[in-house]
Amino acid sequence: MVKKKSSKAAPATIARNKRATFEYRFEEKMEAGLSLMGWEVKSIRMGKVNLSDCYVFLKNGEAFMHGCTIIPLNTASTHVVCDPLRLKKLLLSRKELDKLAGLVERQGYSIIPISMYWRKGAWVKVEIGLGKGKKDHDKREDTKAREWEVEKARVMKKEKTHG
């Protein structure tokens, strides 16, 4: 019997900001569209994007992503002056922008891009997280917990094969 493919395909991840999940504790995540130029889309298709030093700020009621490096391709950007660190406007609804603005201004939250992925094969989306920075002891606790999970899985696997 042949399985039917689900109508919702898993989004294809382009880039992930691993440092963000280590340095921040996210309380809420949301999806935002990106306003991009043609050469940026071509570079993203080739995987020439880096989210590691990236953050989101709000200005004049709009959200912008700063620090996202998109390296231009030599073949795709011959007639356009390319700025790899250009500000990218995030496409969010007014309700989402107002919610973000309230939390950032009043409660000291940060907005950090977590990952970039393709939605429906043609749209580049960014998963942004709303959270606060972790303290050093929180980072150590997370590292210990992660190491314990790995060790526990190793012991369970060993028990399963030998016992």
From Swiss-Prot:
GO terms for molecular function: RNA binding. It is found in: Cytoplasm. SUPFAM superfamilies: Small protein B (SmpB) (SSF74982). GO terms for cellular component: cytosol. The keyword RNA-binding applies. One of its GO terms (biological process) is trans-translation. The keyword Signal does not apply. Disulfide bonds: none annotated. Its main location: cytoplasm. Keywords: Cytoplasm, RNA-binding. InterPro entries: SmpB, SsrA-bd_prot, SsrA-bd_prot_CS. Belongs to the SmpB family. Required for rescue of stalled ribosomes mediated by trans-translation. Binds to transfer-messenger RNA (tmRNA), required for stable association of tmRNA with ribosomes. tmRNA and SmpB together mimic tRNA shape, replacing the anticodon stem-loop with SmpB. tmRNA is encoded by the ssrA gene; the 2 termini fold to resemble tRNA(Ala) and it encodes a 'tag peptide', a short internal open reading frame. During trans-translation Ala-aminoacylated tmRNA acts like a tRNA, entering the A-site of stalled ribosomes, displacing the stalled mRNA. This is SsrA-binding protein. It comes from Shewanella sp. (strain W3-18-1). The gene is smpB.
